[in-house]
């Protein structure tokens, strides 16, 4: 049970569920919303009651251990899975229609303003058009942020789409861009791999876990410009078989249910 719904507190007390921990963002002192307090309480209570738990990345597990949450509890590593995304991607033709796909959101950790500062700092003759995905519920707010950077004509904010159209956006991009201060997992990297696309992303732990020859990391504006040019100049290296997260997920599922 994800600790995000109305039955989570009941399940925590009954002890009949496995708690899935995506990230620990709700435990940050800055989060004072009712939903954050509810999620925090459910996680802390489940930990106190020695519930089994599932973590979705090694980064999340390191944080859990560092704050001594779920101490002496049985934990399972179930990486985020993208079976449906992968199924659709396999049916898509992989094209390059000459745009960057920024997969983001409006949460503080996404640092959308910081991403747009980097984008606007690219020389105009080198700057590909940008499509922003993940802000469907806050398009007007995002447009106001864009206005501050004077690159409105080069940016399209994508509204809510069904998964088929989302996958199509990935498959038709030049590369995927994920800019964030912190993540529990970093699904954009895995989705880029499933779409056979290179990805440019901030050098944070959750993204570094998934580093390979198609992942380009940066820490500051200078790094960003270097890696931006590198990702444009390079060719995608077809090194992926089955997504490693899927292999781990299947083995852990068998372990959880005691199958040989």
Q: Can you annotate each of these PLM segments?
A:
Residues 1-260:
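Carbohydrate transferase catalytic cores enriched for Leloir-type hexosyltransferases
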């Amino acid at each position: 049970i994800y600790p995000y719904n109305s039955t989570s507190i009941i399940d925590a007390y009954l002890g009949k569920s496995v708690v899935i921990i995506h990230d620990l963002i709700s435990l940050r002192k800055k989060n004072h919303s009712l939903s954050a307090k509810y999620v925090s309480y459910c996680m802390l209570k489940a930990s106190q009651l020695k519930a089994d738990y599932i973590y979705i990345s090694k980064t999340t597990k390191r944080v859990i251990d560092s704050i001594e949450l779920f101490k002496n509890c049985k934990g399972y590593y179930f990486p985020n899975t993208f079976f449906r995304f992968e199924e659709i991607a396999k049916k898509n033709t992989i094209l390059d229609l000459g745009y960057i796909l920024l997969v983001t959101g409006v949460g503080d950790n996404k640092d959308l303003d910081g991403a747009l500062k980097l984008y606007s700092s690219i020389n105009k003759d080198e700057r590909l058009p940008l499509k922003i995905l993940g802000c469907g519920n806050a398009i007007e707010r995002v447009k106001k942020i864009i206005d501050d950077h004077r690159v409105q004509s080069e940016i399209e904010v994508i509204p809510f789409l069904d998964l088929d159209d989302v996958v199509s956006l990935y498959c038709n991009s030049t590369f995927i861009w994920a800019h964030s201060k912190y993540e529990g997992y970093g699904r954009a990297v895995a989705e880029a791999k499933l779409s056979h696309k290179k990805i440019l992303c901030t050098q944070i732990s959750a993204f570094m876990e998934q580093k390979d020859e198609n992942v380009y990391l940066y820490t500051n504006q200078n790094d960003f410009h270097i890696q931006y040019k590198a990702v444009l100049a390079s060719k995608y290296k077809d090194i992926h078989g089955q997504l490693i997260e899927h292999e781990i997920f299947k083995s852990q599922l068998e372990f959880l249910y005691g199958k040989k």
